[in-house]
């Protein structure tokens, strides 16, 4: 009888959950919030890297832009940029080269792969150059060569020391032989500066390779390097296939080069400004 029928134990609901509940968005973590350290492979909260961009676990130094390095190195509000507005003539009419340059300029805020000018470091005036690997891997083309050459010529005329932070993937292939001639062009300007008994300090950063290594990067009176910076001419695989030997794991690292006499000292990023200031003072730095 219906009067005494047993009630269901459960309440029946619509099995289609979307009909009564709106789907919740999946939580997302912004890409720029964390980074994986190439050295220790740990995932690091960006804020833990600090302004110096150094891994708190293993001390690996992340690559930084020219403007970031400028802020870490020079006295506040002392930098005056020079030699801007120089543009390549695109000698090979390389496909899409000018479009690529325009895009990279917009992305980096730089006109080329090297930032040049004068600045004070610990109160001492220097001619300063900082290469930026974010700009087509800081490859050396005609404009990079011209800016660095003019920097040395200016420093020679004004009797200033030169401090140059190097970083490069080598010569800029889009400019062919014109890029290669920059090696000799800059080296000649370095030689004139040296003949005037003026101080030239290079700071090798990751990566410094190719024609930059084969010329002005290794011509400094003192050659500094950041720890674990990759410094070399040809690539590791190219060398191994040529000599048919397995190279050491630390081959082309700054520490390996120091052991073999190619680098004078290795300095942690946090100590570079102080160390550069000391070296300038020892070599008769001019206070402004």
Describe each region flagged by the PLM.
Residues 21-28, 39-46:
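Short, intrinsically disordered, charge-biased short linear motifs at domain edges
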Residues 34, 52:
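Residues immediately within or flanking Cys/His clusters that coordinate Zn2+
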Residues 37-40, 55-58:
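Short cysteine-rich clusters marking metal-coordination/redox-active sites
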Residues 46-50, 63-69:
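Short Cys/His-rich "knuckle" micro-motifs
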Residues 71-125, 131-136:
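Extended interfacial segments that mediate partner engagement and assembly in macromolecular machines
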Residues 115-194, 201:
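Cleft-lining beta-strand/loop regions that shape enzyme active-site pockets
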């Amino acid at each position: 009888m219906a009067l005494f029928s047993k009630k269901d134990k459960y309440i029946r609901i619509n099995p289609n959950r979307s009909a009564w509940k709106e789907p919740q968005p999946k939580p997302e973590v912004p890409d720029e919030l964390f980074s994986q350290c190439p050295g220790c492979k740990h995932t690091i909260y960006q804020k833990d890297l600090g302004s110096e961009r150094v891994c708190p676990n293993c001390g690996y130094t992340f690559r930084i832009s020219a403007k970031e390095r400028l802020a870490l190195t020079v006295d506040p509000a002392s930098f005056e940029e020079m030699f801007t507005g120089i543009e390549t003539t695109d000698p090979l009419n390389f496909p899409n080269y000018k479009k690529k340059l325009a895009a990279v300029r917009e992305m980096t805020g730089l006109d080329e792969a090297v930032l040049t000018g004068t600045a004070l470091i610990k109160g001492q005036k220097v001619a300063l150059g900082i290469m930026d690997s974010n700009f087509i891997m800081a490859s050396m083309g005609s404009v990079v060569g011209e800016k660095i050459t003019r920097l040395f010529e200016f420093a020679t005329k004004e009797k200033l020391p030169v401090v140059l932070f190097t970083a490069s993937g080598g010569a800029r292939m889009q400019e062919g032989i014109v890029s290669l001639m920059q090696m000799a062009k800059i080296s000649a300007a370095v030689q004139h500066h040296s003949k005037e008994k003026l101080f030239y300090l290079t700071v090798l950063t990751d990566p410094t390779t190719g024609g930059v290594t084969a010329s002005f990067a290794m011509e400094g009176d003192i050659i500094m390097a950041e720890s674990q910076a990759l410094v070399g001419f040809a690539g590791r695989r190219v060398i191994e296939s040529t000599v048919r030997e397995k190279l050491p794991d630390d081959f082309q690292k700054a520490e390996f080069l120091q052991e073999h006499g190619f680098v004078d000292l290795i300095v942690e990023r946090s100590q570079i400004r102080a160390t550069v200031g000391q070296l300038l003072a020892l070599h008769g730095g001019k206070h402004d």
